[in-house]
Amino acid sequence: MLSLSEAIILGIVQGLAEWLPISSEGMTSLVMVTFFGRSLSEAIPISIWLHLGTLLAAIVYFREDVKVLLYGVPDYVRSFSRKQPHDPVISFLLISTALTGIVGLPLLLFVTDNVEISGGSATAVIGIMLIVTGILQRTVSRDESLSRVPGMSDSLVSGVAQGFAAIPGISRSGITMSALLLRKFDAADAIRLSFLMSIPAVLVAEIGVGLMGMVELDINSIVGLFFAFAFGLVTIDLFLKVAKKVDFSYFCIGLGVLSVLTMFL
């Protein structure tokens, strides 16, 4: 599936790009299409596989949040009348994950089954989606936001938004944080909820990819996973702080334009 050098490079790219609103799937797919000669339908399952590495890094980083939520699940299931402080977040994750699957699975199947483009055309498709991501980020204001617990409408909007991240070039963190900011969450809560909702969504995606036999597991794919985890764990704290302060919309738009232009070179 991957050579050793490809696995290492892709793992590093995934580990670095996951925490920034620039589409790690788009970045790894762009590398595979541009430099490794893969088609877009070949690149996407590999990109999803590498997300498992950064998922593990996110679980380690958000371990206290994850622990509280897991401990709260039994009480959440047993009683809906005796509400606990973490219940709104559990409901948010359950509903948003379900919506992500409903929206994202058909998109993933369509792209992997019907989009056999490669080379400049595939690069241009990813570039267009990066431009869309950048424009979306430009339209979102971080002013007049507040810290609050998520509700039903927040779950619906965020879950649908996350589903569209199945399209390479659409940043999962970028589109979900944008959705949460539009719902008037402050930046810190938007980032925290965005990455918490990525944990069940990525787990479900990994199970789906595995059941459909879309990824061939070998030693090199494990190496790629390890590098994604290691670089993700080392960079997550710094990059999340950077993501709160830096506007990455121009990066997405600029890289997207360059990617589209490669089709004509």
UniProtKB/Swiss-Prot annotation:
Its main location: membrane. It is an enzyme of class 3 (hydrolase). Keywords: Cell membrane, Hydrolase, Membrane, Transmembrane, Transmembrane helix. The chain crosses the membrane at residues 42-62, 90-110, 115-135, 160-182, 195-215, 222-242, 245-265. Its EC number is 3.6.1.27. GO terms for cellular component: plasma membrane. It is found in: Cell membrane. Disulfide bonds: none annotated. It holds the Pfam family BacA. Catalyzes the dephosphorylation of undecaprenyl diphosphate (UPP). HAMAP family: Undec_diphosphatase. This is Undecaprenyl-diphosphatase. The gene is uppP.
